[in-house]
Amino acid sequence: MHLQSVARLTRQCHGLPLVELPPPYLAPSLHFSLIRTPVQCSSFSSTAVVGGRGRDLNKTRGVSAIHRTGPRFKLGVSKYPLPKPVSPAALEKREATPDHGLWGFFPRDRSALSTPEYDVAHGRSWSIQELREKSWEDLHCLWWVCVKERNRIATSNLERQRLKAGYGEWEASERDRTIRVTQNGIKHVLRERWYAWEDAKRLYKNGYRPQDEENQE
């Protein structure tokens, strides 16, 4: 039952006792208003935190990465002013370093994309017999020359895919395959030397001395 209807019914009945009122399920507010004791509804506190309604103690309130909302209060980025961007026309022209190490990732003409004629102009891979005659320093230098050349081929392949050139894939893959054969040969030779050193160390621990055989002869 509406509150105004209950109030009007109460005024018409001139304060009827509870037995003469409608049932509670029809007019619950009328019954509660008669038996309810007065209580304090407003909150009261003498502390400064509750009394300061205008102050928000949560510094991150209102910040949302989803809704892209910033904080409620203005925050300073730095105590120093932000630098202003300089116009490219006002900058000094810098000359490229002719012997920079990054030029090793490009062809000799320093073009971004190698031509098929350049990629196909290569020799054969190193054989294992030829690599066995090389020293440790030569194998080390040859290995990093192969790594540098493969990086150069990968740079050209990435640029070729970006430009959608449609040519040069076969020549570059053949050159890369030849280099990988040389690298496999270098690893094979180093593996042989490792096994030979392990065998020599084991023979020495067992008491084998080559000079003893020479003295017996």
Swiss-Prot record:
Subcellular location per the Swiss-Prot or TrEMBL entry: Mitochondrion
Any one GO BP annotation for this protein: mitochondrial translation
Main subcellular location of this protein, as a coarse class: mitochondrion
Record bears the keyword Transit peptide: yes
InterPro entries the UniProt entry points to: MRP-L47_sf, Ribosomal_uL29_mit
A molecular function GO annotation: structural constituent of ribosome
Entry's Gene Ontology cellular component terms: mitochondrial large ribosomal subunit
Coiled-coil residue windows: none
One matching Pfam family: MRP-L47
The UniProt record lists the keyword Repressor: no
Keywords noted in UniProt: Mitochondrion, Ribonucleoprotein, Ribosomal protein, Transit peptide
Description of how the protein assembles with itself and partners: Component of the mitochondrial large ribosomal subunit. Mature mitochondrial ribosomes consist of a small (37S) and a large (54S) subunit. The 37S subunit contains at least 33 different proteins and 1 molecule of RNA (15S). The 54S subunit contains at least 45 different proteins and 1 molecule of RNA (21S).
Family, as annotated: Belongs to the universal ribosomal protein uL29 family.
Protein name, as recorded: Large ribosomal subunit protein uL29m
Gene coding for it: mrpl4
